[in-house]
């Protein structure tokens, strides 16, 4: 069986093609999903990619979270479908209530476009089993609203229950506790601000470290079949 991973396109999405390529290089079939779709076309997992969906009006991800396709994603994700939000996709997952916290303007109010080392904190999620805890992965980041914020009790919960997945080693955006990515209680839903789909080939990225997220998802899918 070949795993099918859907990649959503909203108006303003930028990185859907890159995410689809990452899915294919990892060994799965990439399935295009449009923001107005309600049928997820039989996919086994979903990637919500980066960009500036709906121009980031209201708040980043706020309008996209209400799109028809996201209503279907929310239903399936709550049933255990592996779901990954990257950058704007992470913002969308928080707005949709699938992940806790919020992403706000970077410290210093600047847009940052950098390659960054992330520490893998939790390698037991559907998207991180190809890594070891403590691994450092080198991936691009590009965002203006990536500063992870949450109430103190939420931070305590995320830390105490192992829901922090990635930490910045350079924390250029001011995220609380250096948090770059988190998961939900089941480990099936993951969001991160940096871009693993831009680190899959040495020709175009700073490393191939990002491919591990997509291979991990394929393994999670096949393990449940």
UniProtKB/Swiss-Prot annotation:
GO cellular component, one term: cytoplasm
EC number assigned by the record: 6.3.5.3, 3.5.1.2
Keyword flag Nucleotide-binding: yes
Domain (Glutamine amidotransferase type-1) ranges: 4-225
SUPFAM superfamilies linked: Class I glutamine amidotransferase-like
GO biological process, one term: 'de novo' IMP biosynthetic process
Keyword Ion transport: no
Gene3D superfamilies membership: 3.40.50.880
Active site positions: 87, 195, 197
Catalytic reactions of this protein: N(2)-formyl-N(1)-(5-phospho-beta-D-ribosyl)glycinamide + L-glutamine + ATP + H2O = 2-formamido-N(1)-(5-O-phospho-beta-D-ribosyl)acetamidine + L-glutamate + ADP + phosphate + H(+); L-glutamine + H2O = L-glutamate + NH4(+)
Location in or out of the cell: Cytoplasm
Entry GO MF terms: ATP binding; glutaminase activity; phosphoribosylformylglycinamidine synthase activity
UniProt entry keywords in alphabetical sequence: ATP-binding, Cytoplasm, Glutamine amidotransferase, Hydrolase, Ligase, Nucleotide-binding, Purine biosynthesis
Pfam family membership, one: GATase_5
Annotated signal peptide: none
Pathway in which the depicted protein is active: Purine metabolism; IMP biosynthesis via de novo pathway; 5-amino-1-(5-phospho-D-ribosyl)imidazole from N(2)-formyl-N(1)-(5-phospho-D-ribosyl)glycinamide: step 1/2
Protein function: Part of the phosphoribosylformylglycinamidine synthase complex involved in the purines biosynthetic pathway. Catalyzes the ATP-dependent conversion of formylglycinamide ribonucleotide (FGAR) and glutamine to yield formylglycinamidine ribonucleotide (FGAM) and glutamate. The FGAM synthase complex is composed of three subunits. PurQ produces an ammonia molecule by converting glutamine to glutamate. PurL transfers the ammonia molecule to FGAR to form FGAM in an ATP-dependent manner.
HAMAP family, per the entry: PurQ (MF_00421)
Quaternary state and interactors: Part of the FGAM synthase complex composed of 1 PurL, 1 PurQ and 2 PurS subunits.
Protein name (Swiss-Prot/TrEMBL): Phosphoribosylformylglycinamidine synthase subunit PurQ
Organism annotation: Corynebacterium ammoniagenes
Gene: purQ
